[in-house]
Amino acid sequence: MKTIKPEEINPQPVEFNGAYIPGVTIRWLIKKEDGAERFAMRYFELEKGAVIPEHQHEWEHEIFILQGKVLITEGSEERVVEKGSAVFIRPNLPHSYKNIGDEKVLMLCLIPYLKG
């Protein structure tokens, strides 16, 4: 069994198209090296106004908002999501995230490991 708190892991910058995204960090809480063969659990922090630009890939996301208010787009759909909400992002659809609140957004994001 592994137990860990996010603050026990150093935050890493998030890279997008060869550059770091300002105001966004990630902490890999649970990953393959921990014995998790099917899913990874990640902890994101988005500072006020920070944006994870539109992107897409072949895996889904399962997200839980721990703090803050975030505008999430998936394809042509936009939703404002707040603390205590779960979100499912479908695979192969463009999606993005923007902190539109007055505080930092904290969110858990699970992704599957795809068989290659």
Report each predicted region and the residues it spans.
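Ligand-binding loop in jelly-roll beta-barrel domains
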Residues: 91-116
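Conserved short histidine dyad/triad with adjacent acidic residue
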Residues: 42-57, 91
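Anionic, Ser/Thr-rich low-complexity intrinsically disordered regions
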Residues: 40-41, 108
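Short acidic-glycine-tyrosine-enriched beta hairpin
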Residues: 77-91
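Glycine- and acidic-residue-biased ligand/ion/polar-headgroup-sensing regions
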Residues: 59-61, 65-70
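A short, N-terminal "cap"/entry segment at the start of jelly-roll beta-barrel domains
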Residues: 1-38
